[in-house]
Amino acid sequence: MAELATIARPYAEALFRVAEGGDISAWSTLVQELAQVAQLPEVLSVASSPKVSRTQVAELLLAALKSPLASGAQAKNFVQMLVDNHRIALSPEIAVQFEALKNAREGAADVQIVSAFPLEGAQLAELVTSLERKFKRKLKPAVEVDSSLIGGVRVTVGDEVLDTSVRARLAGMQAALTA
C-alpha cells in the first residue's frame, strides 16, 4: 500500500493546490465521487480496453460524477491526466490523501470510534468533545459497533490508538499474569 500512497501523493497535492483557489469541500466531494466511480469493475474494464480512446474514458468518468465541478475545465484536465497516465485505479488513494490534506488545513482529523454498543447522539457528542480536548483538534467521527469489545471503546486518530475496551483490559491482565 505504501507504493500506492507514494504514487498518489503528488496527484493529491497538485489537486489540493488547485482546490485552494476555490471551494475545498466541493473538490473533496468530487474526488470522493471519482474514487467511488473508479472502483467499479465495469469502469476499470472500459478504462483498460484498447477499443476505447482515453478521451472517451475521461468523458465517461466525468459523466458519472454528480458534482457541479465535474463540468469545469480543471476537473476535466485532472481526470484526463489520470486517464492519460493510467492512474484511474489510484483514485481511492488520491481521495484519502486529499482528505488528509484538507483535514491538516482545517486542523482536524478523522477518528474511528469502535464501541461495544451503539452510541446515541448525546453520548457520541460528549465522547467526541472529550476526545477533541484530549487530542487538541477537531475530530470527524466514524462510528462502528463491535460486540467483541465486551464494553468500552477503541479510538483511532491517525496512528494513535486509545483502547479503553474491556477486551483490551482483559488482554493486559492476561499478559501480566502469564509474564
From Swiss-Prot:
Its main location: membrane. GO terms for molecular function: proton-transporting ATP synthase activity, rotational mechanism. It is found in: Cell inner membrane. GO terms for cellular component: plasma membrane; proton-transporting ATP synthase complex. It is a peripheral membrane protein. Keywords: ATP synthesis, Cell inner membrane, Cell membrane, CF(1), Hydrogen ion transport, Ion transport, Membrane, Transport. Pfam families: OSCP. PANTHER family: ATP SYNTHASE DELTA CHAIN (PTHR11910). F-type ATPases have 2 components, F(1) - the catalytic core - and F(0) - the membrane proton channel. F(1) has five subunits: alpha(3), beta(3), gamma(1), delta(1), epsilon(1). F(0) has three main subunits: a(1), b(2) and c(10-14). The alpha and beta chains form an alternating ring which encloses part of the gamma chain. F(1) is attached to F(0) by a central stalk formed by the gamma and epsilon chains, while a peripheral stalk is formed by the delta and b chains. F(1)F(0) ATP synthase produces ATP from ADP in the presence of a proton or sodium gradient. F-type ATPases consist of two structural domains, F(1) containing the extramembraneous catalytic core and F(0) containing the membrane proton channel, linked together by a central stalk and a peripheral stalk. During catalysis, ATP synthesis in the catalytic domain of F(1) is coupled via a rotary mechanism of the central stalk subunits to proton translocation. Belongs to the ATPase delta chain family. This is ATP synthase subunit delta. It comes from Burkholderia mallei (strain SAVP1).
